[in-house]
């Protein structure tokens, strides 16, 4: 088993410029696979025993210069060959947190807990077939409270951006847009899958569905029970203003379909 893991690590970490980066990448991967709930550097280093140099692992994760996109691309190529995917599945996962030190942690809804709670949220892209699936691309969702350009910015959270290593140019992006960005990235790796599957968190966004159509991608997505639709030829109009109260908003001429 260890030999197989070493072969896998050698393949996905091959783009790293230095031998020590490849070595600590493999050790970090082994640490993630060890028993134990906490996957931060210090407890993983303790579980790894002689191989677990806490300082070296922390340097690899936080400051060593390597591009994660190169690792994700090699993982995607390997999984594409193994899975032979028929669909891309998008989902988001909550990582429950007790404190507020982690990057992008905020009180937000997550299906992991089934409620609004303190957590990070990650958006993931999975290659999927009838037999198997694997996550090959992912993004950490940055809430508006962490974006200094947002009117909903929280000064305390914005002040933690530097300590958390969040680049200045990174701001709030809706989850459905992160999903479209990941489609574009996987296509740049040469992976073309013509079907997307996602739940209502993505399907309710008309811009997401339009983005899929612009990319010539078929889709099966969930929508909420309150979603309405109009015939393609329908055009909204503004009723006459009676001179009192707020001006009327645009309405569609026919009853919506549900």
Task: Please give the residue ranges for each predicted region.
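Short, glycine/acidic-rich beta->alpha junctions
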Residues: 36, 71, 117, 200-204, ...
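Electropositive nucleic-acid engagement tracts
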Residues: 16-22, 28, 32-100, 218-220, ...
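An internal, acidic/charged active-site-proximal segment
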Residues: 153-258
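A short, surface-exposed helix-loop junction/capping segment
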Residues: 20-27, 163-164, 189
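Active-site-proximal, Lys/Arg-enriched surface segment
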Residues: 60-145, 149
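Short, charged/polar micro-motifs that form catalytic or ligand-binding hotspots
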Residues: 15, 30-34, 47, 111-112, ...
């Amino acid at each position: 088993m260890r030999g197989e893991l070493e072969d896998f690590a050698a393949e996905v970490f091959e783009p790293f410029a230095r031998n020590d980066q490849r070595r600590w990448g493999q050790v970090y991967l082994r640490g993630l696979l060890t028993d134990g709930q906490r996957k931060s550097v210090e407890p993983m280093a303790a579980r790894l025993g002689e191989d677990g140099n806490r300082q070296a692992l922390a340097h690899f994760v936080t400051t060593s210069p390597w591009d994660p996109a190169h690792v994700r691309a090699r993982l995607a190529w390997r999984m594409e060959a193994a899975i032979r995917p028929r669909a891309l599945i998008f989902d988001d996962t909550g990582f429950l947190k007790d404190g507020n030190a982690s990057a992008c942690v905020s009180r937000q809804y997550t299906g992991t807990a089934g409620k609004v709670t303190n957590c990070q949220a990650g958006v993931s892209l999975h290659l999927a077939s009838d037999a198997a699936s694997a996550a090959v691309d992912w993004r950490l969702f940055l809430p508006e409270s962490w974006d200094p350009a947002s009117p909903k910015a929280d000064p305390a959270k914005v002040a933690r951006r530097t300590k958390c290593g969040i680049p200045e140019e990174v701001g709030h992006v809706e989850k459905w847009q992160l999903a479209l960005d990941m489609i574009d990235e996987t296509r740049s790796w040469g992976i073309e899958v013509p079907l997307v599957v996602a739940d209502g968190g993505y399907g309710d966004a008309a811009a997401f569905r339009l983005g899929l159509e612009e990319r010539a991608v078929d889709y099966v997505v969930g929508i909420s029970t309150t979603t309405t639709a109009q015939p393609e030829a329908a055009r909204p109009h503004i009723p006459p203003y009676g001179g009192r109260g707020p001006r009327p908003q645009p309405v569609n001429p026919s009853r919506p379909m549900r």
